[in-house]
Swiss-Prot record:
One of its GO terms (cellular component) is cytoplasm. GO terms for molecular function: translation release factor activity, codon specific. Belongs to the prokaryotic/mitochondrial release factor family. The lineage of its organism: Bacteria, Pseudomonadati, Chlamydiota, Chlamydiia, Chlamydiales. This is Peptide chain release factor 2. Methylated by PrmC. Methylation increases the termination efficiency of RF2. It is found in: Cytoplasm. PROSITE patterns: RF_PROK_I (PS00745). Keywords: Cytoplasm, Methylation, Protein biosynthesis. It comes from Chlamydia muridarum (strain MoPn / Nigg). Gene3D superfamilies: 3.30.160.20, 3.30.70.1660, Release factor (1.20.58.410).
Length: 369
């Protein structure tokens, strides 16, 4: 037991060292925090509410990161202290407590090692996630709603805020199309692994003959970008349409034409938003999404040229099938890109196992710092 603990401690110390070296320099973060706190106490701080909000969020994030880092460092030092003490290391009760501390520290180190794979230009950003029903009619619409639930639960487990930007319900049940905004650090870095077609195989609850059906839903993920990134959108290249916001069952939740749809002719990209209170706000949200999608398209084209000799030759296209979810005659979720699979489909649909699939993807395709 003691020998096993020694080896695990060695790995934890190595992981902590790599974290300091490549991901999180606590001294650097402390300096950044102090500088931002000095800004926040200036009389003019709230003159620019948007900027003040971003700085306040950054301060809170830095405080949380430093808290987590120091907690981990203290736990590892505590483990080291008890293992070096001959009497304590032989105590069974202390060994049980050490095991709990090891599990906590190993999990945290694993999370931070995953962040090392998120070195893309926009990986740290919030993101938009759109789910669209494919072939399969009502069954596919129900599949979209199931994926919406899975992603919402998964995002909440990461502490991200989930906003519904646009939604179109199915004629009988489910959802034809939905766009979410996942607000939080590294939301795009994680969620980008989900872009592609998701295939469902099950006995349909909408079929009185209880036949097995195959349905499809496509997921598209694109990062939120700030005003520092310039994306040219000429007025003549877009068409702006307005319509009434609608809720479940097609019932109008707003009697004015406040929802906005923007079509970008050069790329064929269409974005829509009905979540805001006014047409002006929805139009602004649409333009932000359009800028993000155009920028992502440009990035993707650039990466495709750069990656001709890299691992990405495995051909991951945005429209390709990436994962199968089989409910009957057996239960299995399998990622066709990595080969990773699990049998507990209910835990998967509850959002509890999605991280394992994403980490497998990042191990193959992520950019390492």
């Amino acid at each position: 037991m003691h020998e096993n603990f020694d080896k695990r401690l060695e790995l934890l110390l190595e992981g902590l060292s790599l974290t300091r070296r490549f991901l999180f320099d606590p001294e650097e973060k402390e300096t950044e925090l102090k500088n931002l706190e000095q800004l926040s106490i200036q009389d003019s701080f709230w003159d620019d509410v948007s900027r003040a909000g971003r700085i306040s969020e950054k301060i809170a994030r830095l405080k949380q990161q430093l808290l987590e880092y120091n907690e981990l460092k203290n736990k590892i030092n505590s483990i080291k202290f008890f293992l070096e003490d001959e009497e304590s290391s032989k105590d069974l009760e202390i060994q049980k407590e050490l095991e709990k501390e090891f599990i906590f520290c190993e999990k945290k180190i694993a999370e931070w090692e995953t962040l090392r794979l998120l070195a893309g230009e926009l990986d740290r950003n919030s993101c938009f996630l759109s789910i669209n029903a494919g072939a399969g009619g009502t069954e596919s619409c129900d599949w979209v709603e199931m994926l919406f639930r899975m992603y919402s639960r998964w995002a909440n487990s990461h502490g991200w805020k989930v906003e519904v930007i646009d939604r179109l319900d199915g004629e009988v049940a489910g959802i034809k199309h939905i766009t979410l905004k996942l607000i939080g650090e590294y939301a795009y870095g994680y969620a980008k692994a989900e872009s592609g077609v998701h295939r469902l195989v099950r006995i349909s609850p909408f079929d009185s003959n209880a036949k097995r059906h195959t349905s499809f839903a496509s997921v598209e993920v694109f990062p939120e970008i700030d005003d520092k990134i310039e994306v040219e959108i000429r007025p003549g290249d877009i068409r702006i349409d307005t319509y009434r916001s609608s809720g479940a069952g097609g019932q109008h939740v707003n009697v004015t034409d406040s929802a906005v749809r923007i079509t970008h002719f050069p790329t064929g990209i269409v974005v829509s938003c009905q979540s805001e209170r006014s047409q002006i706000q929805n139009r602004e949200a649409c333009m932000n999404m359009l800028r993000a999608r155009i920028y992502q398209k440009l990035l993707q084209e650039r990466l495709e040229k750069q990656n001709t000799n890299r691992k990405e030759k495995k051909e991951i296209s945005w429209g390709s099938q990436i994962r199968n979810y089989v409910f009957q005659p057996y239960t299995l979720v399998k990622d066709v890109r990595t080969g990773y699979e699990v049998g507990n489909i209910q835990a998967m649909m509850d959002g509890e196992l999605l991280d394992a699939f994403i980490k497998a993807y990042l191990a193959d395709y992520g950019e390492i710092t």
